[in-house]
Amino acid sequence: MGHKIHPTGIRLGITQEHRSKWYAPSKTYPLLLQEDDRIRTFIKKKYVAAGISDVLIARKADQLEVELKTARPGVIVGRQGSGIEELRSGIQKTIGDRNRQVRINVVEVEKVDADAYLLAEYIAQQLEKRVAFRRTIRMAVQRAQRAGVLGLKIQVGGRLNGAEIARSEWTREGRVPLHTLRAEIDYATKVASTTYGVLGIKVWVFKGEVLPKEEQPLPVGSSPRRSRGNRRPQQFEDRSNESK
């Protein structure tokens, strides 16, 4: 089942967060959902060169919060923050409400080569430049391994290298445990438009397992401490800055 279902959808609330965080009654819910889709489409088309990994949207009363995860924040922010104002006015025009308060937060992706969407975007760019797909996949795997990922799976489907019959090929390096719900799996898809048609790209990145605090593994050679009943928890107060 883990290989059939969407890796992100099955892990929502466990290791993944919702991309849209808001509540609305049943009458306005479809309108706000379409509004989110228009905002994401507008941002992805406007900032193609910014390497946007994800767009998170939150709503609080009349305020709209948009968080952009990007590999190149300077492209969005612009000189002296002029790009933020341009983006804010563009979002207000897209949703058709010039008076809506829009708050924008730009977050830089620390490890670009460990992000599934940015890896898929890199593969799509190379395929559109007519680079052989096996060479492209090998280069993407090397970049991800240098970034320190624990596992990676890449699948490319379509008329590979201009073949008459479409097929799909995939490769995997390391562990990609799709059945383990506590495994942090970053999943993304991308479409590459080539002269022979479109190629579908899927990328799975395994970044580790997220364990609850009570299930954290003990250090090697240590044993669990015995319970001493309902002992009062110790409290420590930092007084290092007090004058003597």
Curated annotation (Swiss-Prot):
InterPro entries: KH_dom, KH_dom-like_a/b, KH_dom_type_2, KH_sf_prok-type, Ribosomal_S3_C_sf, Ribosomal_uS3_bac-typ, Ribosomal_uS3_C, Ribosomal_uS3_CS. GO terms for biological process: translation. Residues 234-244 have a biased composition (Basic and acidic residues). Residues 214-244 are annotated as: Disordered. Gene3D superfamilies: 3.30.300.20, Ribosomal protein S3, C-terminal domain. GO terms for cellular component: cytosolic small ribosomal subunit. GO terms for molecular function: mRNA binding; rRNA binding; structural constituent of ribosome. Residues 39-110 form the KH type-2 domain. Keywords: Ribonucleoprotein, Ribosomal protein, RNA-binding, rRNA-binding. PROSITE patterns: KH_TYPE_2 (PS50823), RIBOSOMAL_S3 (PS00548). Binds the lower part of the 30S subunit head. Binds mRNA in the 70S ribosome, positioning it for translation. PANTHER family: 30S/40S RIBOSOMAL PROTEIN S3 (PTHR11760), SMALL RIBOSOMAL SUBUNIT PROTEIN US3C (PTHR11760:SF19). Belongs to the universal ribosomal protein uS3 family. Part of the 30S ribosomal subunit. Forms a tight complex with proteins S10 and S14. This is Small ribosomal subunit protein uS3. It comes from Prochlorococcus marinus (strain NATL1A).
